[in-house]
UniProtKB/Swiss-Prot annotation:
Belongs to the UPF0502 family. It comes from Xanthomonas euvesicatoria pv. vesicatoria (strain 85-10). Signal peptide: none annotated. It comes from the Bacteria. Gene3D superfamilies: Winged helix-like DNA-binding domain superfamily/Winged helix DNA-binding domain (1.10.10.10). This is UPF0502 protein XCV4380. PANTHER family: UPF0502 PROTEIN YCEH.
């Protein structure tokens, strides 16, 4: 694929699995590349995933093989278990920061600039929110992301990846409205967001520590 090639069109399972590979490469390097089982656990996490899914092992395995066919994933044969790593950056000629942003959008759907900046801390380094905006604009120019029109009541622009085809903007706006029917305003909202992000980060760290232990046990038994 080149900068002028159209982006691939991924289904829900493929998008989730690819996002998980991007995330875990940065957050649990000891457990990466991922086994099929580890990819399934990551795909079905209850935190840092929007929407929460319940993908079966066969669905995850099929998604990995399809991503491999598209050239976005590569299988490693270094142990008894199949392990997979993503190739998004090399295939689409993206920077680490751009790969991280695509990963977040694959895992959590439409997000604001501030959300992407806060959530990207463990995936890639950005100087500030303007740096995030710069990389988002580059992705938009490449046809890999889009800025969504603001829905009624929304104060900030949101961004979404385009790796699953054209966006249904009305459906995305309706989903956002259902997710936050009575959000608090002002400083209360900011404080709540900060507490939720801190709690979410703690839960994810515990899950990743468990995944690293499982990976070491698998390696010891290989």
């Amino acid at each position: 694929m080149t900068e002028t090639s159209p982006p691939p069109v991924l289904d829900t399972a493929q998008a989730r699995v690819l996002g998980c590979l991007i995330e875990k490469e940065a957050t649990t390097p000891d457990a990466y590349p991922l086994t099929v089982n580890a990819a399934q656990v990551a795909a079905n996490q209850k935190t840092a995933r929007e929407p929460v899914l319940n993908l079966q092992t066969g669905v995850v395995h099929h998604a990995l093989r399809q991503l491999e066919t598209l050239g976005l994933v590569r299988q490693q044969f270094s142990s008894r278990a199949e392990r997979y790593e993503h190739r998004l950056g090399s295939v689409l000629d993206l920077t680490r920061q751009q790969v991280a942003l695509i990963g977040l959008l694959l895992l959590r759907g439409p997000q604001t600039l501030g959300e992407l900046y806060a959530r990207s801390e463990r995936l890639a380094r950005f100087n500030d929110a303007d740096d995030v905006r710069h990389h988002l604009e580059r992705l938009i120019q490449r046809g890999l992301a889009a800025q969504l029109p603001r829905a009624s009541g929304q104060r900030e622009d949101r961004y979404m990846h385009l790796l699953s085809g054209e966006l249904d903007v009305e459906a995305l706006q309706a989903a956002a409205a259902r997710a936050a029917p009575s959000a608090p305003s002002g400083s209360d909202s900011s404080d709540l967001d900060a507490r939720m992000q801190a709690l979410e980060a703690t839960v994810v760290e515990l899950q990743e520590a468990l995944a690293a232990v499982q990976a070491r046990l698998e390696a010891a038994g290989a």
